[in-house]
Swiss-Prot record:
Subunit structure: Homodimer with distinct heme coordination in each subunits.
Gene name per UniProt: HB
UniProt name for this protein: Anaerobic nitrite reductase
Species per Swiss-Prot/TrEMBL record: Parasponia andersonii
Keyword annotations of the record: Acetylation, Cytoplasm, Heme, Iron, Metal-binding, Nitrogen fixation, Nucleus, Oxidoreductase, Oxygen transport, Transport
Swiss-Prot/TrEMBL catalytic activity: Fe(III)-heme b-[protein] + nitric oxide + H2O = Fe(II)-heme b-[protein] + nitrite + 2 H(+)
Amino acid sequence: MSSSEVNKVFTEEQEALVVKAWAVMKKNSAELGLQFFLKIFEIAPSAKNLFSYLKDSPVPLEQNPKLKPHATTVFVMTCESAVQLRKAGKATVKESDLKRIGAIHFKTGVVNEHFEVTRFALLETIKEAVPEMWSPEMKNAWGVAYDQLVAAIKFEMKPSST
C-alpha cells in the first residue's frame, strides 16, 4: 500500500455512506461479525492457525465460544473507526489498543495477504448486510476506511514492549 493510498482524504460523501450503512448494521453486529470471520476462514482456512483457541479445536467455527465475541469486537471496532475517520482524520482506536493489536498481529505472524483477505471479507459482509445501499461508491468508502485502519495497525506491528 503506497503512502498516497493511506493518506487518501475521506470525503463527506464517503462518511455519509459509511454512517448510513453502520446505522443499519449496528443492531446486528454480533451476527455480522461472525459472518465476517467465517468468510475470512472460508477464503483462507489457514488463518484459523493465527488464533490459539481455533488452531486445534474440534468445535465447529460457528459454535466456538470465543470466536463470536472476538469477531464482534473486531467488526464493531472496524466499523466505528470508519464512522469516525473523517472527523478524526485518522483511524480512531485508542493508542494503547492499537499498540496491543499491532503487537498481537506481529507475534501471530499476520502478513499483508491476511489484511487483503480480511478487506475482501469485510466488503462482502457489508455488501450482504446492506444490499439495497451497496454501490461502487460505498465499496470505495469502506475500502478507504479499512485501509486507514490497517495502516495504523501495521505501523504498530512490532514486538511488544511489555
